[in-house]
Amino acid sequence: MDGFHDLGGFQGFGKVPHTINSLSYKQVFKQDWEHLAYSLMFVGVDQLKKFSVDEVRHAVERLDVRQHVGTQYYERYIIATATLLVETGVITQAELDQALGSHFKLANPAHATGRPAITGRPPFEVGDRVVVRDEYVAGHIRMPAYVRGKEGVVLHRTSEQWPFPDAIGHGDLSAAHQPTYHVEFRVKDLWGDAADDGYVVVDLFESYLDKAPGAQAVNA
């Protein structure tokens, strides 16, 4: 979805700290309670089978911007999971408020219904030139906005397939399963001639891609 929750990030909130070619990783959980966020999520996903991980991601996207910036990463997943537990009838808002002793603010209601995958096309092959579909989606999507309408080259097609996130993220259990593709883009094609030379590889679901017009395969 467009806006603050775009998968590619959002301007105005500072740089994302990272270390190049490092085997040193930050501690995953900094406080004792943080691991409970994923534990609670997988109770709903695996034990109760009430929703999917993609629905949790979409519930995080449904957080009000002010609520999002005022909470930590794992807090957002607790709020998202609690939202889905209420929406699927496992608990009620009143029960949640009573247990906590105060009103617990959930994510905003979903206003989009999702969309099905594009099916019936032959898969893309390594070396194919592809173009990312230039689409603006109101609901859940796993495509960063900065690659919309951009051309790239397929480097790899995954052997595994997963439910199309734009559908399963809205509870559509019939979502088509698709591979994802590692697509290489020129940095200058994404951000203009003033950008550094180089390439960016983005993992994209099949339904986000089309064959580039008049394109010939690039030898891998």
Curated annotation (Swiss-Prot):
InterPro entries: CN_hydtase_beta-like_N, CN_hydtase_beta_C, CN_hydtase_beta_dom_C, Elect_transpt_acc-like_dom_sf, Nitrile_hydratase_bsu. It is an enzyme of class 4 (lyase). Keywords: Lyase. It catalyses: an aliphatic primary amide = an aliphatic nitrile + H2O. Its EC number is 4.2.1.84. Industrial production of acrylamide is now being developed using some of these enzymes. One of its GO terms (molecular function) is nitrile hydratase activity. NHase catalyzes the hydration of various nitrile compounds to the corresponding amides. Belongs to the nitrile hydratase subunit beta family. Heterodimer of an alpha and a beta chain. This is Nitrile hydratase subunit beta. It comes from Pseudomonas chlororaphis (Pseudomonas aureofaciens).
